[in-house]
Every structure is written in structure tokens, then in C-alpha cells.
Amino acid sequence: RQRQMCIRDRLRLSKETQGRALFNWHMFQKDMGELKDLLTKSSHIYPGLGDAGAHVSQIMDAGWSTFILSYWYRETGTFTLEQAVEKMTSGPAKVLGLTDRGVLSLGMKADINVFDADQVTELQPTLVHDFPNGAPRFIQKSRGFKATIVNGAVSVRDGELTGTRAGK
């Protein structure tokens, strides 16, 4: 059973953190059974597709791809590892008409994420103020990703940027 935080607890935490506490509010699709039906019975639903950051100061949905691995693959077994990876790679590429991406093949463009499927998990979103004029946005980090390789160069290692910028 998921613990519901009462208003008294929220007010106390808000006071203790001088208003900096963040509270998750799951707005959409709370019924995981219905969501499972949508994800498994339709070949047209790819949760990794987002709004390109249009609402980064209000909502956080960047953890979806990690959630596919941690929840739908590892915890529930809804997808095999191969199916989970397809939901994040070739499936969305096809939907978007990106014919040169989505699979690892000679001549294709590819960023490669190296991860430990037994460790991948999404962390709590955090609010940062790194937009122009100190405007806020939510970011969500993860655990279990070992490296991101772009055009043969490691750009992220163990969650930290390496400074290498090999993208085109």
C-alpha cells in the first residue's frame, strides 16, 4: 500500500525546509493495470516520447525511459529486456520518421547507453535554477547507467559529464 502524506506532514516539511521541500503529485495514469494494457496491447504507444522540455518548471517526465527498465522490465517482467530497449530506441525512431536512428548498425547514428539492468532506477526529481535569469527547471537523475557514448566518445561516465562533446 502506498503511503499517503497528510496535509499536516506536508506543512511541517515545508516549514522545516523553508518551503524548499518537493512533493510528488502523480497527475496522470495512476492505474498501472490500465497503463500495462495500453503499453502491451498497442504497438503505437512509446512512453519515452515527451514534450521536449516545454513544461520543465512544472512537471518532470524525463524518468520514463529509466522507469521502463526499472519497473516494466525488472520489477514486473511486463517486457523482456529487448522489448524494453525497443520501447526507447527503434520504436520511437520509427514513430518520428528517423530512419537513420534507433538501431545499432553500420552507417546509423547512435548514442549508446551502457547500463546495468539490475541496478537502473530513477531518482527523485530536483529543482535547479540554471536557466537564463535563474529560472527554475526540474531535472531527474538516475542510477545504474555506466556510460553514454556519442560518436565513439564517452560523454557521460557514471552519471557525470566527461566534457567530451562529440555530437553533431
Regions found by a protein language model. Give the residues of each.
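Mid-to-C-terminal alpha-helical segments outside catalytic/metal-binding sites
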Residues: 9, 87-91, 110-111, 149-151
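Flexible loop/turn segments at secondary-structure boundaries
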Residues: 17-21, 54-57, 92-95, 120-123, ...
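Short, small-residue-biased leader/transition segments that mark boundaries at the very start
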Residues: 2-7
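Non-catalytic terminal accessory segments
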Residues: 8-15, 19-36, 40, 44-50
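C-terminal cap of metal-dependent C-N hydrolases
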Residues: 37-45, 114-160, 164-166
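Acidic, glycine-enriched loop/beta-strand segments at the rims
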Residues: 22-33, 82-85, 93-127
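Gly/His-enriched, cation/cofactor- and phosphate-binding structural elements
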Residues: 61, 67-94
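Short acidic/histidine-rich active-site segments
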Residues: 41-62, 107
